[in-house]
Amino acid sequence: MSFKPDLFEDEEGKKLPLANENELFILQRAKITFQCKTPDHAVFKGKGRIYCTTQRIIFVAEKGTAQNGCHFEAFEIPLVKMTDEKFNQPIFGACSISGLVTASVELEGGENFSWKITFANGGTGVVLPVFLRLMEKRKKKEEIDITFVQSQKKAFVDPNDPTVIYIAQPTKPATAVQSS
């Protein structure tokens, strides 16, 4: 997990995560509320979007803010370090996905951070099946193959769910400046 995933700005000024080697983007979801809590109980919150890939979930804030002595603009959750993930569907309020992610040994001594992604606008009819399938593959230690990613572009679209399915992979424009 990382508070500083590599980001770049597209032509419209929107920040996107750079893809890792052999990583494919599956979906993007805007209007997300994100929260994570460190082992020493520092809380980081933001509003923005998530990117779901074959390797990780990345939250990117609409704008970075100073929180707990740090500049917080993004948070990366590698699927292989994710545990205790669950879908929360309260009677009142917005649905969310939450869980734990193991920190690197250099950061917080390898302890767990808790995280929560709240879907503040719209349903979860597209995000949830993709998330559950990724978790199933991870638990079985299966590689996520290209056919799974390609099958997502045939998903049924819920008009109440503003999720964007990637049909083509986002590319870093030649003129884009990498942000940190």
Where are these regions (language model features)?
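Conserved beta-hairpin
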Residues: 43-67, 71
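Surface loops and adjacent helix of pleckstrin homology
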Residues: 29-30, 37, 55, 62-64, ...
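Anionic N-terminal interaction surfaces
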Residues: 1-51, 121
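Acidic, Ser/Thr- and proline-rich intrinsically disordered linker/docking segments
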Residues: 2-7, 11-13, 44-45, 71-180
